[in-house]
């Protein structure tokens, strides 16, 4: 992560529920009060997903809380927001998402030079066995690190 990036929100559930493959960066089409709420950290990616319609990518289900100091022109909290990506990237992701078992999920939202960016990834759902296996590997790695720390 570079100096200019500030992570606002992460979708930890995506790492647990899916095996993440290719990652892409996408810009977001936002309204004025939405970017203000994002800068305050009032955004959730938990149940959001990416859909493709007519050669365009949209994020659905992303919750951005209303801006506290906004007036009656405040934004809709869960509206569909268009993603800004290169045409080739959208086509590649759209074709990959049509393959059975694959989907595109948001991983994190961050600010880069004052602009809100969304990191998305091509993902394949894990079954219960894979989730347990990855948890065991994580626990084993944690134990190794703990043992090494106590050794010195």
Predicted features along the sequence, with ranges:
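A structural signal for short hydrophobic beta-strand segments in well-ordered beta-sheet cores
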Residues: 48-52, 109
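Flexible glycine-/small-residue-rich
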Residues: 32, 52-54, 61, 120-124
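C-terminal end-helix/capping segment
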Residues: 78, 85-88, 126-152
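Beta-rich strand-turn-strand
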Residues: 84-121, 125-127
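Short, surface-exposed beta-strand-loop junctions and turns on beta-sheet-rich folds
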Residues: 36, 44, 51, 64-67, ...
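Intrinsically disordered, Lys/Arg-rich N-terminal extensions and targeting peptides
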Residues: 1-31, 139-152
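Helix-adjacent hinge/juxtasegments
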Residues: 53-93
């Amino acid at each position: 992560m570079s100096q200019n990036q500030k992570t606002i929100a992460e979708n930890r559930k995506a790492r647990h529920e899916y095996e993440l493959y290719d990652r892409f960066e996408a810009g977001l089409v936002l309204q004025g009060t939405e970017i203000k709420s994002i800068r305050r950290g009032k955004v959730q990616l938990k149940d959001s997903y990416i859909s493709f319609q007519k050669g365009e990518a949209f994020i659905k289900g992303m919750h951005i809380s209303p801006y506290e100091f906004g007036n009656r022109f405040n934004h809709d909290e869960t509206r569909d927001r268009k993603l800004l990506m290169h045409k080739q990237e959208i086509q590649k992701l759209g074709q990959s998402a049509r393959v059975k078992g694959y989907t595109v999920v948001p991983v994190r939202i961050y600010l880069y030079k004052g602009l809100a960016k969304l990191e998305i990834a091509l993902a394949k759902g894990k079954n219960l066995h894979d989730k347990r296996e990855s948890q065991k590997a994580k626990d084993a790695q944690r134990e190794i690190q703990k043992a090494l720390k106590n050794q010195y």
